[in-house]
């Protein structure tokens, strides 16, 4: 019996037991979190156990070291060196394989001219035409069953001008090489195409060019490897549908990592990035976008280097892609279910998938069945007189305490906005922790204050029922969102899981009441309110408790007395000050009322019909009331808390650094933090009012620490820097001044940093900082002249870009007023790969340009010196982007056709039609090499000294990236 007494004491609903169980729960969640984030680092293949995998990893790491030795954007000569190295490696791997073929776009001089929407801004109405000369390297491995739909594996080998491209996308490229090496040894059943593509960074152009290749007709599926962060684990960022998600589930058995929350966030444009997967998806392919996703403040900076990543990160991407490609290459695929997928992994051990449409149907079932069951059980318990009636004060305690916590949270968020709005960039844990502790602490204080004056029995069960009602409302709203989005809101699944488990807990309580001991009188109110100065328990309840005490066996007497003492000791209403209302929360009884209620019989041992309850029935009731809370706790707290915490962490981990990208992103991150902390708090709120003083003291202490860290600590450090965008602009139409543009977040960050630069503080250079859109700040100053070319004389910037008008018939008398105007330009640019022409008419709202022609020079076909590509657009063309490979080819030859104003508005009475038909052309040409030198008058000088100065003298709490596709932009303008 002593063991039983200990067991009952440990499991009884007491403050200490509850607090200990909460501690254990959160400790387990913390350990699982650490395990999830660290386990992949311990799974590298060992040479003695997996020699083939070890060789693939070591070879890939060596390849990565070579291709990330320098910056290699499309606009640099280093880009060609990376291309040549990859081509050499591809030829080495394929060797004399009978089923392998290699195609080099650079050798075949492949180019495309096409119209595209801005791939990084879907809301843009700017009509863009792009000319691109490709240097993609494609490899075809013909499968044993070539009639099966093929698989494309893709990664891009260009970097941005300010990054080495280790993660973006060097790891993807060397993973493709490893996959190629593996499949050469293990011939696939279906045909595989490998696309080592170029110039993803400035328009996803390598992927677009793929569909100009005849091999594109062989592939239906795609695995795109990308890096939109700087290391960590490679996540299944998005996938086409439920079928492809299940293929990932079936193939990636070791260290799966994916979450459809990322997919919803990406499609909702909370992340301002894109990958080649967008192009493949738009062209009807189905597949998987596997990418690194954090941290974004190192993404596209000098820290995207091999020093800031690891073999563990490389192996995670390589092994994931290898498992997936091997499965797809060798198995028949079930691709019937093309509805969007909800998916997530459990600490890298198990991957779960459900169709978003199926989830919606289940939500509908939950929404319909759960209230019917709950109401039915309520009616049964009321009919059996086992329902405990609650006052309106009792019903409002839980929701009002939750509302008060949200209000306090909102007030605190206002303090964050005023004092430290970018704090999430440094560490999102502290603000989330502050929000979370605010909610639970406010709930604790209000519920216990209410219970002090108006005691309520069974507050826990009432709160669980109210939580069920709140979650039912939330699930109704989210289900509507899921349906209206055509099932693309794939990140809402955690709420369905939370609702299901909370519903089970609430139904169990209602079921216990419905099946409870029947009485002949309705139970009175269980909660003392301001309308009554006595407890209104029915006589039957009190007599029944008395009978229970009389009928207990003698050998259980000591245990029973201990239990009763613990109940009174832990009661939420017992206090040393104020009214002494000792409410037995499990038995629904105010012990003090027994002395004052005239309905209480003088003899508790009365043998009346109402008191004739068996010892067995009372024992069962006591057993339920003692231990049922554990079942409710285990249903509501551990699993929902882990899933909700993990979901919030997933969101914040991907988005916290986006606060640097504008005030809108800052608001989004703050909003996600507030809502996320409420969701994390909800599972424990029905229980938290009963924790002991140590737990609540630690909660208050954690809030004070979190709040101070959130409000007072500087948001940027060496490991979490502020990312600033750089460009140096030279407008030849306004002189040769080399104006440096530095773009970053408002908040007195940029100007103090710039004022400390030697070239500024020793020359009194003026810095002009102005606010631009979306909470950003642009600072401009005249910087040191760039040295873009090697020369034996003085560098003349004006000679870098020259525009020659070869033909223009706007004022020709031979042209009819109704005839389109035609002009031909020769754009002379030295050692350049990228330029942009922008067309604008001062007298027409839309661009009048309807046709663009690009005249190409083919090195392999000198007899066909001018090969033309032409594109037409009825809606007008605003911009022409030019990308060429040959640095020695110093000209772009362009033809432009535009409509006269007479054709667009039909105003024949306008006497200035000639002037109104003028077309303004703005030219911008880009240079992206900075980590190299030019030789000027026999002396080696840095190409972009203004950028070098920023890198060398700015505090380590700043990182730098390019504002546009080049670091130096030379501009000019003409009127045709």
Curated annotation (Swiss-Prot):
An example Gene Ontology CC term for this record: fungal-type vacuole membrane
Stretches with biased composition (Low complexity): 559-570
Annotated site residues (Transition state stabilizer) in this chain: 299
Comment on bound cofactor: Binds 2 Zn(2+) ions per subunit.
Residue intervals annotated with topology Vacuolar: 37-359, 413-428, 483-496, 649-668, 714-976
Transmembrane stretches, start-end: 16-36, 360-380, 393-412, 429-449, 462-482, 497-517, 628-648, 669-689, 693-713
GO biological process, one term: proteolysis
Catalytic site: 200
Localization: Vacuole membrane
Segments in the Cytoplasmic topological domain: 1-15, 381-392, 450-461, 518-627, 690-692
Known EC number: 3.4.-.-
Biased composition (Polar residues): 549-558
Record's bilayer topology term: Multi-pass membrane protein
Domain of life of the source: Eukaryota
UniProt biased composition (Basic and acidic residues): 582-601
GO MF annotation, one: metal ion binding
EC class name: hydrolase
Residues binding Zn(2+) 2, per UniProt: 168, 201, 300
PTM text: N-glycosylated.
Pfam (any one): PFF1_TM
Cofactor (UniProt): Zn(2+)
Keyword Metal-binding: yes
Region (Disordered): 528-610
Similarity field: Belongs to the peptidase M28 family.
UniProt protein name: Vacuolar membrane protease
Gene field: PFF1
């Amino acid at each position: 019996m002593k063991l039983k007494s200990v067991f009952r004491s440990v499991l009884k609903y007491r403050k200490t037991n509850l607090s200990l169980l909460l501690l254990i729960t959160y400790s387990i969640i913390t350990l699982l979190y650490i395990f999830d984030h660290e386990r992949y680092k311990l799974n590298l293949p060992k040479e003695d156990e997996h020699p083939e995998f070890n060789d693939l990893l070591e070879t890939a790491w060596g390849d990565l070291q070579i291709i990330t030795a320098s910056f290699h954007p499309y606009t640099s000569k280093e880009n060609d060196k990376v291309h040549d190295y990859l081509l050499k490696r591809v030829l080495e791997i394929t060797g004399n394989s009978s089923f392998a073929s290699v195609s080099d776009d650079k050798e075949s001089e492949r180019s495309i001219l096409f119209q595209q929407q801005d791939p990084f801004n879907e809301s843009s109405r700017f009509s863009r035409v792009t000319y691109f000369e490709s240097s993609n390297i494609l490899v075809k491995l013909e499968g044993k069953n070539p009639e099966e739909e093929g698989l494309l594996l893709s990664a891009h080998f260009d970097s941005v001008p300010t990054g080495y491209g280790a993660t973006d996308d060097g790891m993807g490229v060397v993973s493709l090489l490893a996959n190629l090496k593996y499949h050469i040894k293990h011939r696939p059943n279906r045909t595989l195409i490998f696309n080592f593509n170029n110039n993803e960074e400035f328009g996803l152009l390598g992927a677009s060019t793929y569909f100009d290749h005849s091999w594109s007709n062989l592939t239906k599926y795609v695995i795109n490897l990308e890096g939109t962060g700087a290391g960590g684990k490679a996540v299944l960022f998005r996938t086409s549908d439920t079928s492809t998600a299940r293929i990932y589930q079936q193939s990636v058995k070791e260290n799966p990592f994916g979450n459809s929350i990322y997919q919803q966030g990406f499609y909702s444009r909370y992340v301002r990035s894109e990958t080649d997967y967008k192009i493949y998806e738009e062209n009807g392919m189905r597949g998987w976008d596997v990418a690194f996703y954090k941290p974004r403040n190192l993404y596209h900076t000098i820290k995207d280097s091999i020093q800031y990543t690891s073999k563990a990160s490389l192996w995670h991407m390589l092994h994931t892609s290898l498992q997936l490609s091997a499965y797809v290459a060798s198995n028949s695929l079930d691709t019937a279910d093309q509805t969007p997928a909800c998916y997530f992994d459990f600490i890298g051990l198990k991957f779960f998938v459900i169709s978003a449409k199926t989830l919606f149907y289940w939500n509908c079932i939950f929404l319909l069945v759960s209230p019917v069951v709950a109401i039915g059980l309520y009616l049964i318990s009321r009919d059996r007189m086992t329902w405990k009636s609650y006052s309106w004060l009792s019903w409002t305690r839980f929701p009002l305490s939750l509302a008060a916590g949200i209000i306090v949270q909102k007030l605190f968020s206002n303090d964050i906005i005023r004092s430290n709005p970018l704090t999430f960039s440094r560490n999102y844990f502290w603000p989330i922790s502050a929000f979370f502790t605010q909610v639970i602490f406010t709930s604790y204080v209000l519920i216990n204050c209410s219970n002090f004056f108006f005691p309520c029995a069974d507050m826990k069960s009432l709160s669980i029922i109210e939580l069920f009602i709140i979650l039912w409302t939330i699930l109704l709203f989210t289900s509507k969102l899921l349906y209206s989005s055509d099932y693309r809101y794939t990140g809402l699944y955690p709420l369905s899981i939370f609702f299901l488990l909370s519903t089970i807990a609430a139904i169990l309580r209602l079921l216990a009441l419905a099946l409870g001991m029947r009485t002949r009188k309705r139970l009175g109110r269980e909660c003392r309110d301001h309308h009554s100065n006595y407890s209104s328990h029915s006589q039957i309840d009190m007599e029944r408790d008395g009978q229970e005490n009389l009928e207990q066996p003698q050998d259980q007497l000591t245990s029973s007395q201990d239990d009763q003492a613990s109940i009174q000791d832990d009661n939420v209403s017992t206090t040393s000050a104020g009214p002494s209302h000792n409410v037995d929360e499990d038995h629904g009884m105010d012990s003090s009322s027994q002395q004052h209620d005239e309905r209480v019989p003088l003899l508790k041992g009365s043998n009346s019909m109402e008191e004739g309850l068996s010892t067995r029935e009372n024992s069962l009731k006591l057993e339920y009331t003692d231990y049922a809370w554990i079942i409710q706790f285990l249903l509501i707290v551990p699993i929902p808390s882990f899933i909700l915490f993990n979901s919030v962490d997933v969101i914040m981990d991907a988005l916290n650094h986006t606060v640097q990208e504008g005030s809108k992103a800052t608001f989004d991150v703050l909003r996600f933090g507030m809502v996320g902390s409420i969701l994390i708090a909800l599972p424990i709120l029905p229980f938290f009012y009963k924790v002991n003083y140590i737990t609540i003291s630690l909660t208050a202490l954690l809030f004070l620490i979190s709040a101070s860290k959130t409000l007072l600590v500087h948001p940027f450090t060496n490991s979490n820097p502020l990312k600033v965008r750089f460009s140096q602009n030279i407008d030849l139409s306004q002189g040769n001044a080399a104006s440096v543009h530095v773009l970053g977040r408002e908040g007195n960050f940029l100007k103090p940093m710039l004022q400390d630069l030697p070239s500024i503080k020793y020359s009194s250079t003026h810095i002009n900082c102005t606010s631009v859109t979306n909470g950003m700040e642009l600072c401009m100053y005249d910087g040191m002249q760039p040295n873009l070319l090697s020369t034996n004389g003085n560098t003349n910037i004006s000679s870098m870009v020259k525009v020659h008008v070869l033909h223009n018939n706007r004022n020709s008398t031979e042209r009819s007023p109704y005839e389109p105007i035609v002009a031909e330009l020769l754009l002379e640019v030295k050692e350049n790969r990228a330029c942009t022409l922008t067309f604008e008419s001062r007298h027409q709202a839309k661009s009048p340009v309807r046709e663009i022609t690009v005249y190409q020079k083919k090195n392999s076909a000198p007899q066909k010196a001018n090969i033309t590509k032409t594109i037409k657009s009825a809606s007008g063309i605003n911009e022409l982007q030019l990308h060429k490979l040959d640095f020695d080819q110093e000209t772009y030859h362009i033809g432009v056709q535009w409509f006269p104003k007479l054709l667009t508005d039909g105003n024949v009475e306008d006497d200035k039609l000639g002037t109104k038909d003028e077309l303004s052309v703005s030219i911008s040409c880009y240079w992206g090499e900075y980590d190299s030198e030019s030789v000027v008058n026999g002396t080696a000088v840095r190409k972009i000294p203004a950028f070098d100065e920023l890198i060398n003298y700015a505090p380590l709490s700043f990182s730098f990236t390019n504002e546009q596709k080049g670091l130096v932009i030379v501009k000019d303008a003409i009127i045709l």
